[in-house]
Amino acid sequence: MQLRLLGGLTAREFLRRHWQKRPLYVRGALPQFRDLLDAADLLALASRDDVESRVVVRRGRRYVTSHGPFARLRARPRDWTLLVSGVNLHHEGADTLLRRFSFLPQARLDDVMASYATLGGGVGPHVDSYDVFLIQGSGRRRWRLDGRTTVLASAGDLIYLPPGVRHDGVALEPCFTYSIGFRAPRGAELGAAFLDWLHERGLPDARYRDRRLRPARRSAEIPAGMVDFAARALGRIRWSRSDVASFLGEYLTMPKPQVVFQAGRARRAGIICLDRKSQLLYRGAHFFMNGERFTVPRRSAATLRRLADERRMSNAALARAGLGRLISEWQRRGYVRAEAS
């Protein structure tokens, strides 16, 4: 199906031609697009402890960054930008915008960052290590891509940038820009987290002991016996592909440190919706909800996968699949909420 969001390309065509290959500019990708929030709303978010924010001020060729939360914040008349990350965690409209990109795996979706800039505002030329969609809100912004292409973005325009493309956006008037970012964990980051995960589940834990220790001729030299012991201990660490999949599911769904869920009451009517802070993924017979791994009876699995994919489903359908008790527990934890049909 052709998507106006992608300039008339199908999702398959976009992924083949542009994804992680070359930029795409779509004028009017979101017709009649209106800002998700106003400057006062964004300033209010930037004052909160559970929200990541920063202000960038351009001073000549320098860009000075301050990090929130900000007790008192007032926009300067020019060369000033406020950026707030994870707006989708706090604003329903931002979460809806993020879900428009569901033709990509949820495991890759990260967040919506909203920025408000006054005349001349920007963060300077830079390169991102991840894919990003830039959606222009009110006002206009001039983008220079790779130092060669200039794009004048107006409300509803979309720019896709693959990793490594140098870009620089400057506000031509007070404006909003919304960035859809994607998760791209580094190998070293995954490796360190995986070793922690293995350790929590129990690793061989024998303690080093000296065997036939002799007086040290060079007291600062590391004994060969200690090197041999460390090599043997590390060599005993074993894991399977199933272990990796389980770790990854828990890792990818783990809420960010600042996320707090509001406990609710169990309701058996209406439509069940995943809270916008919740992440429900699956792999094979295993499901992962907000950092926890679990399984369900085979007769329930297809229904739960559908809830994960669509993020909403009738409470009655979930109950018929034998998931009523699980959904009630999630309502009490604040992971899901019930809405009127």
Residue ranges of model-derived segments:
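Active-site region of the double-stranded beta-helix
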Residues: 1-17, 30-157, 165-207
